[in-house]
C-alpha cells in the first residue's frame, strides 16, 4: 500500500490540472502562434511559467485505484498488474478469464 500522502498529492495534482487546463491550453496556443510579436510571446511564456508546476498534466502519476501502487498500472482497468491478476483469477473482472491450452 502506498503512502496516503502520495495518493493525496496526486489527487490534488489531478484537480489542479483539470481546473487550469483551459488556461494552459489558451496560453500554449498563443505562444505557438507565429503572427504574435516576439515580445508578446515572451510575456505569454512568462505568464505560463507563473502557473503552478502541479497544474501540468505531465506531473500526474497513474496509480492503482485499490492500492495506490504507482508502477505497473493497466490503464484500461485503472488497477495494478498484481491486483488485476488477483481479481481476474477469482473471476471478479468481467470479460477476463484465465487462459489454458
From Swiss-Prot:
<keyword id="KW-0694">RNA-binding</keyword>
<dbReference type="InterPro" id="IPR023036">
    <property type="entry name" value="Ribosomal_uS14_bac/plastid"/>
</dbReference>
<dbReference type="InterPro" id="IPR001209">
    <property type="entry name" value="Ribosomal_uS14"/>
</dbReference>
<comment type="subunit">
    <text>Part of the 30S ribosomal subunit. Contacts proteins S3 and S10.</text>
</comment>
<dbReference type="Pfam" id="PF00253">
    <property type="entry name" value="Ribosomal_S14"/>
</dbReference>
<dbReference type="GO" id="GO:0005737">
    <property type="term" value="C:cytoplasm"/>
</dbReference>
<dbReference type="GO" id="GO:0019843">
    <property type="term" value="F:rRNA binding"/>
</dbReference>
<dbReference type="GO" id="GO:0003735">
    <property type="term" value="F:structural constituent of ribosome"/>
</dbReference>
<feature type="region of interest" description="Disordered">
    <location>
        <begin position="1"/>
        <end position="24"/>
    </location>
</feature>
<dbReference type="InterPro" id="IPR018271">
    <property type="entry name" value="Ribosomal_uS14_CS"/>
</dbReference>
<dbReference type="GO" id="GO:0015935">
    <property type="term" value="C:small ribosomal subunit"/>
</dbReference>
<keyword id="KW-0689">Ribosomal protein</keyword>
<comment type="similarity">
    <text>Belongs to the universal ribosomal protein uS14 family.</text>
</comment>
<feature type="compositionally biased region" description="Basic residues">
    <location>
        <begin position="10"/>
        <end position="24"/>
    </location>
</feature>
<keyword id="KW-0687">Ribonucleoprotein</keyword>
<comment type="function">
    <text>Binds 16S rRNA, required for the assembly of 30S particles and may also be responsible for determining the conformation of the 16S rRNA at the A site.</text>
</comment>
<keyword id="KW-0699">rRNA-binding</keyword>
<protein>
    <recommendedName>
        <fullName>Small ribosomal subunit protein uS14</fullName>
    </recommendedName>
</protein>
<dbReference type="GO" id="GO:0006412">
    <property type="term" value="P:translation"/>
</dbReference>
Amino acid at each position: 500500500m502506498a503512502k496516503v500522502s502520495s495518493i493525496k498529492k496526486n489527487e490534488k495534482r489531478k484537480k489542479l490540472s483539470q481546473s487550469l487546463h483551459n488556461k494552459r491550453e489558451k496560453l500554449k496556443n498563443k505562444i505557438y502562434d507565429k503572427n504574435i510579436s516576439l515580445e508578446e510571446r515572451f510575456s505569454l511564456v512568462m505568464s505560463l511559467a507563473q502557473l503552478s508546476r502541479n497544474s501540468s498534466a505531465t506531473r500526474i502519476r497513474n496509480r492503482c485505484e485499490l492500492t495506490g501502487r504507482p508502477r505497473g498500472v493497466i490503464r484500461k482497468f485503472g488497477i495494478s498488474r498484481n491486483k488485476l491478476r488477483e481479481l481476474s483469477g477469482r473471476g471478479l473482472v468481467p470479460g477476463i478469464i484465465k487462459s489454458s491450452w
